[in-house]
Amino acid sequence: MELILLEKVANLGNLGDKVKVKAGYGRNFLLPFGKATVANAANLAAFEERRAELEKAAADRKSSAESRAAQLAELEVTITATAGDEGKLFGSIGTHDIADALTASGVEVAKAEVRLPNGTIRQVGEYDVAVHLHSDVEATVRVVVVAA
């Protein structure tokens, strides 16, 4: 299936690239989420007319993500959780908890933007958490987990 990308897609291509993908990936992900359109003559002409508008929107999203990353770089978030004597948490701190704490401190962050590659946090301590704001912009936030 040949598609024209309407925005940058990780591990696939940039805005305006003509890519060949498997039918399921195109039909179930790229087309429904508005990330691509079918590559035919009519859509190619329509894309070229809208190209400047799409590039400006992509640049606006990236600049917004960069400004949020600058705010996040200065931030240190403290999360209080119940823990045992040895610092092991009763439960865990996940992406949702971190996103809520960041939003409460003044920077709007969605749960899907928080990356915990080693899984949820289960110990008291300080952690550096990656926040993936845009395909080109990633920020690191210091999260301090303290026992209640």
Curated annotation (Swiss-Prot):
UniProt GO molecular function: rRNA binding; structural constituent of ribosome
HAMAP family, sorted: Ribosomal_bL9
NCBIfam families membership: L9
Keyword set includes Repeat: no
Signal sequence residues: none
The keyword rRNA-binding appears for this protein: yes
Species whose genome carries this gene: Pseudomonas putida (strain W619)
Family of this protein: Belongs to the bacterial ribosomal protein bL9 family.
Keywords on record: Ribonucleoprotein, Ribosomal protein, RNA-binding, rRNA-binding
Function text: Binds to the 23S rRNA.
GO biological process, one term: translation
A cellular component annotation (GO) from this entry: ribonucleoprotein complex
Alphabetized Pfam families for the sequence: Ribosomal_L9_C (PF03948), Ribosomal_L9_N (PF01281)
Official protein name in the record: Large ribosomal subunit protein bL9
InterPro entries linked to this entry: Ribosomal_bL9, Ribosomal_bL9/RNase_H1_N, Ribosomal_bL9_bac/chp, Ribosomal_bL9_C, Ribosomal_bL9_C_sf, Ribosomal_bL9_N, Ribosomal_bL9_N_sf
